[in-house]
Amino acid sequence: VEPLKHRVDRFFLLTQNGTDIPTEIRAGLVTFLTASYIIFVQPAVLSETGMDFGAVMTATCLSAALGCLIMGLWANYPIALAPGMGINFYFAYTVVIGQGISWQTALGAVFCSGLILIVLTLLRVRALILNLIPDFLKSGIAAGIGLFIAFIGFVQGGLVVENPGTLVKLGNLKSLPVIFTLSGLVLIGVLLQRKIKGAILIGMVLLTLLGLPFGLVTYQGLVSMPPDMGPTLMQMDIAGAFDLGLITVVLVFVFVDLFDTAGTLVGVSQQAGFMEHGKLPRATRAFLPDAVATTAGAAMGTSTVVCYIESSTGVAEGGRTGLTAVVVAVLFLLALFLSPIAQMIGGGYTPEMGKTLYPITAPVLIIVGCLMASNLTRIDWGKWDEALPAFLTFVGMPLTYSIADGMALGFITYPVLKICSGKSVHPVMILIAVLFLLRYVMLGD
């Protein structure tokens, strides 16, 4: 046992990164539990196009596991991957249902976008973009992701609800899910203040146990057999994806993945302290997992795979190496057989005729958003040519409900303000701003 422990330590550089095996396992478990909703949401969304629910669920778990394994073993970062939220709705409701394109052809477009991302990664284009982002924008991105996931936590916990007049309003503080969300915030906050190891995981476990007698968590067994992936396996229509009318669809898949992943890498890396002089070590390796997993995922039967912002929950739990990502990969594979347990914690609670809420995981997202807000202190608020782009990035992510769109606000205003102030801007950053503008002018929403 001891030699194996040393080999794991050397491979993942655990001691060098100030962590250990138990910490990494806890971090992986927390990350998985906060991201496990995708196991059930993804097939629910894609099945609207006629795709088989069970096959998509299996493809989702396998593509997520593949991406996490590559991230952990190749890049050695504690970042989880899975099919992305947002882009899956674009796949289902805009491309397939809205444009009348078959889901097979849409998968072909995802497959082609994955190949393009692999090429861009190997040519180091993606790493170049990441390392050229100024430090103040990196801080704005990290804080913006924190605010974004905190807002998601507020929504999933029922603390804020839709309101036609004011967009959002305070939720019903007397409802049981909201009370549980607030209780979870206090519980995890106290555990963190007392510096209890595994505070976030302990909080989630206690909330789950407390939720059982109140009906917020439903025990549905322990083991289930994985669904057959046959109905979607290798069903993508690559030839159809080369149709002239689908070029914009492929480009949207590429664009969203490119900047969503870049934003997540920046945010999580800032939080974990990975950045060295404004650059991310092993950036090219960190960009390969989502590209490969997207390509493989399309072949299996699911939409674009991205780096998950929920990875920040694992970092908050102490995860600092790829071992965290490997643990997440193993859990996604186990979820094929233990989906009832994953659904018990991450599947949410749906009251009669109501919206599904997630009172177990929502407090975790809000807590992590609080932790990531510390990046705002790194911005020089006295320099308007830096403060305004960072601020627009920060507030843009939750208000547009998109990491990529929030980044666009900052990336477009940054070179404009700098140039108008008589300062120089790297040509690549100007090109990115132009591409963002063209993306909205030519490709639409």
Residue positions per predicted region:
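Membrane-embedded alpha-helical modules
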Residues: 99-213, 326-445
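Juxtamembrane transmembrane-helix boundary signature
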Residues: 64-85
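Helix-loop-helix junctions within the multi-pass membrane cores of secondary transporters/permeases
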Residues: 3-42, 63, 84-93, 97-142, ...
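Helix-loop-helix hairpins and the membrane-proximal interhelical loops
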Residues: 1-55, 168-171, 201-284, 437-438
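Residue-level signature of catalytic and energy-coupling elements of molecular machines
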Residues: 25, 45, 129, 198, ...
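Hydrophobic/aromatic residues within the transmembrane alpha-helices of Major Facilitator Superfamily
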Residues: 29-36, 66-69, 73, 150, ...
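Loop-to-helix transition at the N-terminal end of transmembrane alpha-helices
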Residues: 50-69
